[in-house]
A protein has these predicted regions:
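Acidic (Asp/Glu-rich) sequence patches and key acidic residues
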Residues: 1-132, 136-140, 149-150
Length: 150
């Protein structure tokens, strides 16, 4: 299962420097404030959390991301990771402004992509950690990033 770590950082340049210095290893914990999120990809599973917060159906544009590291691999079909993407600030701000986290966790725990049977208490702990990270990022005026490894 692919690994996804979400973190906040001052900007994409700081992320590139940290990943270059660390050989591509996750910067979560060692360099940047973040959380581990095995199996929670930005464009589908995290976007479904954003949809639950907004109380709207999932759509592909709820979480936009752009590759920031490594530079130049967008067209390389042989490259198999890791990667880092920067998430759009609107997704960060929706998550940072989330209320009624028990409702969000109940809805999100039932999504098909998580198997539809995640324990709601576990889902709530994870939702709270994502929301807290988004709030810290917004407070610091920093973007959210996602480190991805296959």
């Amino acid at each position: 299962m692919p690994l996804f770590d979400y973190f906040r950082a001052p900007d994409a340049d700081a992320v590139r420097q940290a990943l270059d210095a660390g050989g591509g290893a996750t910067p979560v914990g060692a360099v940047f404030d973040g959380i581990e999120a095995k199996g929670v990809d930005p464009s589908v599973v995290l976007a479904m959390m954003v949809a639950a917060v907004r109380q709207v159906p999932w759509s592909a544009d709820l979480v936009d991301d752009r590759l920031v590291w490594p530079v130049g691999v967008e067209q390389d079909p042989e490259y198999d990771g890791p990667w880092v993407s920067e998430l759009n600030t609107s997704a960060r701000d929706v998550l940072a402004g989330a209320g009624d986290l028990p409702r969000v966790a109940r809805e999100w725990a039932r999504i098909e992509e998580l198997g539809g049977n995640v324990d709601v208490a576990d889902a709530q702990v994870f939702v709270e950690s994502v929301v807290d990270l988004a709030r810290r990022a917004r407070e610091a005026d920093e973007p959210l990033f996602c480190w991805i490894s296959l």
